[in-house]
Amino acid sequence: MEDRCLIKNDITELIGNTPMVYLNNVVDGCVARIAAKLEMMEPCSSVKDRIAYSMIKDAEDKGLITPGKSTLIEPTAGNTGIGLACMGAARGYKVILVMPSTMSLERRIILRALGAELHLSDQRIGLKGMLEKTEAILSKTPGGYIPQQFENPANPEIHYRTTGPEIWRDSAGKVDILVAGVGTGGTATGVGKFLKEQNKDIKVCVVEPVESPVLSGGQPGPHLIQGIGSGIVPFNLDLTIVDEIIQVAGEEAIETAKLLALKEGLLVGISSGAAAAAALKVAKRPENAGKLIVVVFPSGGERYLSTKLFDSIRYEAENLPIE
């Protein structure tokens, strides 16, 4: 038999086909099974790797950007920026990012390590202010290009073409309910659309912070769940495929993320904790007995070591005695 080389050409070929795993030890009282889609297993450790590559490739194919000449400029809560910085480094793009000052220190360090230029914004200016700041940078940057993750159709499209089919394949078509947080809306929209085309009875549940319930018609507000709850209804969120909006408090998201580490061995971020908390609520409903819930875990926990998620553990680790 002829040997086949499986070495990838570059980091972009590592994106996708992330594993799924059942939750086993945090499911007391659940009557449905929960399987987590582990997007922290992407090469740059978050679901945003998919859209970073898809938006860059789409712009390249349309002749809008050129490696070695163009500069990518984007407002980000962190993970999309990290994805863009990773892909930019691999493909020869300068990357300039606008990020809220409330995002974790780890994100800043990672972005700088990847060569991105970083501009921090005051949380009070919100997404609208970040977009204005991004446009101002664009006006002064020759060859600049804004991928516009909140509006770019390449965002939900990559989830429709990859994430959705992966979930359908790996669950052998047995998925009944999808649970996903909403940042840009791309994951829920792309995956939800694909799954509903395979089985119209599949339900799509999206997650938002109770402290900023904009999708439910409430007012935006500060919250602890980095990566979701942007304070707007994103253009890329197709509400026609959404069956339910589930609100999760920041503290609940944090506690659930801690439990996932302690009981499942899954070190995940706060938005993954929020998604898991929502999935657990759905899994305890009597009408969902015997069903399979797939929940998307967007990122791992290492990017949150300086946040409230690890406050008590960090203090303990910093004060361990030397024996």
Curated annotation (Swiss-Prot):
Induction: By nitrogen starvation. It catalyses: O-acetyl-L-serine + hydrogen sulfide = L-cysteine + acetate; hydrogen cyanide + L-cysteine = 3-cyano-L-alanine + hydrogen sulfide + H(+). Predominantly expressed in leaves and flowers. PROSITE patterns: CYS_SYNTHASE. Pfam families: PALP (PF00291). Its cofactor is pyridoxal 5'-phosphate. Its EC number is 2.5.1.47, 4.4.1.9. Keywords: Amino-acid biosynthesis, Cysteine biosynthesis, Cytoplasm, Lyase, Pyridoxal phosphate, Transferase. Belongs to the cysteine synthase/cystathionine beta-synthase family. Gene3D superfamilies: 3.40.50.1100. GO terms for molecular function: cysteine synthase activity; L-3-cyanoalanine synthase activity. This is Bifunctional L-3-cyanoalanine synthase/cysteine synthase D2. Pathway: Amino-acid biosynthesis; L-cysteine biosynthesis; L-cysteine from L-serine: step 2/2. SUPFAM superfamilies: Tryptophan synthase beta subunit-like PLP-dependent enzymes. Disruption phenotype: No visible phenotype. The modification N6-(pyridoxal phosphate)lysine is found at residue 48. GO terms for cellular component: cytosol; plastid. PANTHER family: CYSTATHIONINE BETA-SYNTHASE. Pyridoxal 5'-phosphate binds at residues 79, 183-187, 271. CDD domains: CBS_like. One of its GO terms (biological process) is cysteine biosynthetic process from serine. InterPro entries: Cys_synth (IPR005856), Cys_Synth/Cystath_Beta-Synth (IPR050214), CysK (IPR005859), P-phosphate_BS (IPR001216), TrpB-like_PALP (IPR001926), TrpB-like_PALP_sf (IPR036052).
